[in-house]
């Protein structure tokens, strides 16, 4: 199960499609600008 937008994460691979884990605090899945 992937992490949704604003879900806590440690790596981008945990996040759902089009989301990436933020590089700096706070660490959560944010939109990576892709469609």
Curated annotation (Swiss-Prot):
InterPro entries, A to Z: Huwentoxin-1
Keyword Disulfide bond annotated: yes
Name this protein carries in UniProt: Jingzhaotoxin F5-21.66
Organism expressing this protein natively: Chilobrachys guangxiensis (Chinese earth tiger tarantula)
Bilayer-crossing regions: none
Molecular function in Gene Ontology: ion channel inhibitor activity; toxin activity
Free-text tissue specificity from the UniProt record: Expressed by the venom gland.
Keyword Disulfide bond: yes
Cysteines engaged in disulfide bonds, as pairs: 2-16, 9-21, 15-29
GO cellular component: extracellular region
Role: Probable ion channel inhibitor.
């Amino acid at each position: 199960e992937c992490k949704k937008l604003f879900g806590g994460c440690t790596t981008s691979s945990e996040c759902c499609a089009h989301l990436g884990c933020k590089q700096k605090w706070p660490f959560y899945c944010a939109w990576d600008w892709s469609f």
